[in-house]
């Protein structure tokens, strides 16, 4: 990689890569902490509905007050300072900004911002994987047609997994499985923002509950975030979901090749070429030692006896047969390494993972028995969790995407564990996110095309 030298060239030329950030939550704040220190990068503006929170987060990230005191976008461009605003569209329309980072985490907002960014001829880094799971394949197609880059966010696990897959294939290996680790027990699918504290207090040292958004955090616990992220990976790499989605097998870092291989070879997978998320908890509640809860991995196959001998000779974490090996990254640095995506988009016009087809979906699935006329509360809430589902199944059965299961009313009773359908809810067909999703379903009516 030579991104650093390319950034230095832009710095020396007085033409830093110009960035607009929409959404200053945890991911955005982590990006800001490193962006200020990156030569050749200029965050021209930051947009957040809560301007005072945005200013507070900039200060938290180590920015001196004078650095984000620009009175306008024009002033920020000229003074190499940063403008803070509540108007995201102003960033998108600003002719001097090259790259938009969408980090709101709200599917509807992300889709709208992506469409407008593409329309204005700018690259977009989609931190908002929730929006990508709803309509990413169509947004990426529109971006390619417009000659701009739509990309997943480096530092988040999906983009890192895509890099693992690309590395393996570029080296001539067959990819058996790829994914990440998490903390999982089967009953977590029923967790909600009230009882998630039982899990968080047990495993995290939380001294200030006010610093935690329980609904957001619960989306990681109940399996939704895993389904969303593995859907992003499938749609970007050509890997596919298993028929029933993720099974979360327990595994240490050193057992990845043994566990994440096909059942026909003694593993847990339905077939090869799939995504899977390993658990850091055994089914009896014991912690898995040397787990991969914050990391990512890929399992590859040695297709020759010589390659398999090399797996063993160089301790490449092979399975017992020696046929499969694993590579893993123990951590992901979230927004701290997001600058890789920004630089890659602006300087090499290259995505760090981008959808190439509609292979996987995330179906809204009932956490409990739901009653007609209940209002669904979306990701991490009390009503539904997101189950990874093959796109062809979702299309054929009309599943309701998890990202749009927010503030819609049920038309019928739904049993716990049942995947919801479009026909089960009252929705506004003119809503932009709904319209774009429906457009994508029509465009990809034949899966993987």
Residue locations for each model-derived region?
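Rossmann-like NAD(P)H-binding beta-loop-alpha module
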Residues: 143-144, 151-221
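A short hydrophobic/small-residue beta-strand
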Residues: 123-125
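Short acidic, glycine/serine/threonine-rich loops at helix termini
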Residues: 58-59, 136-139, 162-165, 180, ...
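Short, ordered loop/turn segments at secondary-structure junctions
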Residues: 49-51, 105-106, 129-132, 155-156, ...
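Short gly/pro/ser/thr-enriched loop/turn and capping motifs at secondary-structure boundaries
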Residues: 52-53, 131-140, 157-161, 182-186, ...
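Rossmann-fold NAD(P)-binding glycine/threonine-rich loop
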Residues: 104, 109-120, 129-149, 153-156
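C-terminal catalytic/substrate-binding lobe primarily of soluble NAD(P)-dependent oxidoreductases
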Residues: 2-8, 202-449
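N-terminal glycine-/serine-/threonine-rich beta1-alpha1-beta2 phosphate-ribose binding loop
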Residues: 1-116
